[in-house]
């Protein structure tokens, strides 16, 4: 179970890094927001879901 938590945290860190780099690039590029809006919202939704799943799995271990 500890390995599952570690993998979830690794995925959370990786997705956070992608969003921290990707969102400002999309917002700074002219015209990219309209093309990438759905992708950014999907990434934010995945990040939120991953935080919730990680917290639920962590609560089962403790």
UniProtKB/Swiss-Prot annotation:
The chain crosses the membrane at residues 8-28, 41-61. This is Photosystem II reaction center protein Z. It is a multi-pass membrane protein. NCBIfam families: PS_II_psbZ. May control the interaction of photosystem II (PSII) cores with the light-harvesting antenna, regulates electron flow through the 2 photosystem reaction centers. PSII is a light-driven water plastoquinone oxidoreductase, using light energy to abstract electrons from H(2)O, generating a proton gradient subsequently used for ATP formation. Keywords: Chloroplast, Membrane, Photosynthesis, Photosystem II, Plastid, Reaction center, Thylakoid, Transmembrane, Transmembrane helix. Belongs to the PsbZ family. It is found in: Plastid, Chloroplast thylakoid membrane. The keyword Disulfide bond does not apply. HAMAP family: PSII_PsbZ (MF_00644). GO terms for cellular component: chloroplast thylakoid membrane; photosystem II reaction center. One of its GO terms (biological process) is photosynthesis. Coiled coil: none annotated. PSII is composed of 1 copy each of membrane proteins PsbA, PsbB, PsbC, PsbD, PsbE, PsbF, PsbH, PsbI, PsbJ, PsbK, PsbL, PsbM, PsbT, PsbX, PsbY, PsbZ, Psb30/Ycf12, at least 3 peripheral proteins of the oxygen-evolving complex and a large number of cofactors. It forms dimeric complexes. The keyword Magnesium does not apply. InterPro entries: PSII_PsbZ, PSII_PsbZ_sf. It comes from the Eukaryota.
